[in-house]
């Protein structure tokens, strides 16, 4: 138990600093070097696809079995037996809840792109691609150099409108930070509620990769909006702290060791599993495999990410 607690605390610290660095680095060091930007875009895109494979294994090889085990424990306490796929249904409820919250946020914002969109990493694709926005960073004021080419008029689809994010003021950026924060709490909950070391490690790898890339997207949007470094640091700390907050909540629920805490753990893990489904299929795979460049290489990284985490499930930590 002590080793498990130490592992979760290390996960809290690790994810926090990964996200903080990912958020602030673009604000501090982005340069108008098109060749370097193109290379960075390709590397981030491949890392993102690798993260998609990691999340597939995390969801189906680690998190889903954990939800099944926890539900079985809860049902056995009440002497209830059923063949109904409760774990799968609970995860789908979490998935639909995440989609609903996303669309609710977008309805109030009167926008259509997904609220946690890694389209940032698909920037600079060829003309005629299905990505709507291929220019996630366009300089403001003294930062007048374009990091990526401007999007073509023929592009369509859903994407995070980073080009427009800074125009009306800070409200859109704040709404993005709020959405990212709410999303991150559930991912942190999934980590904090785990009872086995190998599941903690596999979840940590998936969350760390995905959330770091999301933090980079946030950093690019803050750089696009010419946010001062001090204000950017405040926003970055806020978002970066949400995973540790979720882990802390999960630890508190798990340490209660009561029937109510077991029920809460099963429900929250199932709902968090739905969030992972949303991230995997509607954020990562839908965006990355939509691109017409490096498709086979992305599939290779997708399989590689899955294989790495699927193998880690069999390890005992």
From Swiss-Prot:
The chain crosses the membrane at residues 4-24, 43-63, 86-106, 173-193, 200-220, 233-253, 266-286, 295-315. Residues 1-3, 64-85, 194-199, 254-265, 316-317 are extracellular. The keyword Ribonucleoprotein does not apply. One of its GO terms (cellular component) is apical plasma membrane. Pfam families: Zip. It catalyses: Zn(2+)(in) = Zn(2+)(out). One of its GO terms (biological process) is cell morphogenesis. It is found in: Cell membrane; Apical cell membrane. The keyword Transport applies. Disruption phenotype: Knockout mice are viable and fertile and under normal growth conditions exhibit no obvious phenotypic abnormalities, and are only slightly more susceptible to the effects of dietary zinc deficiency. It is a multi-pass membrane protein. Keywords: Cell membrane, Ion transport, Membrane, Phosphoprotein, Transmembrane, Transmembrane helix, Transport, Zinc, Zinc transport. Residues 25-42, 107-172, 221-232, 287-294 are cytoplasmic. The modification Phosphoserine is found at residues 125, 129. Its main location: membrane. GO terms for molecular function: zinc ion transmembrane transporter activity. Highly expressed in the testes. Highly expressed in dentate gyrus granule cells of the hippocampus. Expressed in the mammary gland. It comes from the Eukaryota. InterPro entries: ZIP. Belongs to the ZIP transporter (TC 2.A.5) family. Transporter for the divalent cation Zn(2+). Mediates the influx of Zn(2+) into cells from extracellular space. Controls Zn(2+) accumulation into dentate gyrus granule cells in the hippocampus. Mediates Zn(2+) reuptake from the secreted milk within the alveolar lumen. This is Zinc transporter ZIP3. It comes from Mus musculus (Mouse).
